[in-house]
């Protein structure tokens, strides 16, 4: 497979993930930080996460619950964890499979949902969201506009059928 180039959106997202890691006092950029950045992304990946009820404040609290708050005052050398590097690499594999022109945040979200062992995937599962639902919705968003319009009603029904809205769940105090 030909190596795909990271889109400007994905490069910016990785930088944003680094900012989140620094804000949380973490000395690494993990898949959880990539998921946080994806939740704020303006494209399809961010919309899919927000439609599932995963807003940035909710995800931030889940990351803090799992990894804790580090020191924000110390200079912390940062880099992608091996899992995060693998996720970016797998995003390239997804882009190649789909024969797209570059690696986008949507491809990264596809890759994260395929890796059951990564922290981002565990956060999704812990919040009551099936990674497969996120994968299906994201994959649908990557289809051509004609295909998307034809399948829009089906995909919305699938999301409603298999995914919980975390905002509604929180409002019910479950």
PLM region descriptions:
Residues 1-174:
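Histone-fold recognition with a strong bias for associated Lys/Arg-rich disordered tails
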């Amino acid at each position: 497979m030909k190596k795909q180039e990271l889109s400007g959106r994905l490069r910016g997202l990785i930088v944003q993930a680094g900012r989140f890691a620094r804000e949380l006092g973490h000395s690494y950029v993990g898949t959880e930080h990539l998921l946080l950045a994806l939740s704020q992304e303006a494209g399809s990946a961010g919309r899919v996460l927000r439609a599932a009820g995963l807003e940035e404040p909710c995800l931030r609290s889940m990351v803090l619950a799992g990894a804790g708050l580090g020191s924000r005052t110390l200079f912390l050398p940062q880099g992608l964890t091996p899992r995060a590097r693998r996720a970016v690499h797998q995003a390239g594999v997804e882009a190649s499979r789909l024969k797209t022109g570059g690696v986008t945040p949507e491809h990264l979200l596809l890759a994260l949902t395929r890796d059951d062992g990564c922290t981002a995937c565990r956060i999704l599962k812990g919040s009551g969201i099936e990674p497969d639902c996120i994968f299906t919705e994201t994959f649908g968003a990557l289809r051509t506009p004609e295909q998307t319009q034809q399948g829009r009603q089906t995909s919305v029904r699938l999301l409603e059928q298999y995914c919980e809205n975390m905002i509604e769940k929180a409002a019910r105090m479950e």
